[in-house]
């Protein structure tokens, strides 16, 4: 059984595991890892098939969560960005005793638009899947450009994301496709009503992938959770607003 790439740093008395989004890798956290490792024992992870975690094909969400858990500390705050938010949520559902708090960043329990549920139109996700087989580097770059659109620092934020992608070999097409399949099909809205650990949801007001309309809907569906919207951020608030982002996690640490 393959292991995934995993790096731990810092000496904090609380463990914090960071899970990246689709098409990316753990290098995306370099803008905040120094600050966070001064407060936490920080764990940077390349999800199976992404970055340095080679030798995996496309996995289901449940399998991806199990692979990640194998190398994880007994107890930690789990933070997942975008697709990583689904992985962290899945772990909170299946192994709640291992999760001190759940943090989702620019993530939705159901990324795909459904009846009376705002999200990414299924044909857009299907289009990305189709384009992957034609020109997958360009498709990934288009997806990244969507993530920073509208912010004051959109250009440099997009450059930071692109640099992260290009720093390591591109994931295999079937892995990227499998990730899009998860974004297209998974719906955790009902299951997450039952989690009891502290649950913090962070959003960008300008996010083009996770519409802000979902925030009040989830506030109502999950009254035990807390939400916060970064007013001038899009899909990557930790890149556009690193200091504010880290502050929120340090405050959360006091509660676990």
UniProtKB/Swiss-Prot annotation:
Catalysed transformations (reactions): 6-carboxyhexanoyl-[ACP] methyl ester + H2O = 6-carboxyhexanoyl-[ACP] + methanol + H(+)
Assigned EC number: 3.1.1.85
Keyword Cell membrane: no
Molecular functions per Gene Ontology: pimelyl-[acyl-carrier protein] methyl ester esterase activity
PANTHER family from the UniProt entry: HYDROLASE ALPHA/BETA FOLD FAMILY, PIMELOYL-[ACYL-CARRIER PROTEIN] METHYL ESTER ESTERASE
Main location: cytoplasm
Subunit structure: Monomer.
Positions of substrate binding: 22, 82-83, 143-147, 235
Pathway assigned in UniProt: Cofactor biosynthesis; biotin biosynthesis
UniProt organism field: Escherichia coli O127:H6 (strain E2348/69 / EPEC)
Entry protein name: Pimeloyl-[acyl-carrier protein] methyl ester esterase
Keywords assigned by UniProt, alphabetized: Biotin biosynthesis, Cytoplasm, Hydrolase, Serine esterase
Cellular component annotations (GO), alphabetically ordered: cytoplasm
Disulfide bridge partners, by residue number: none
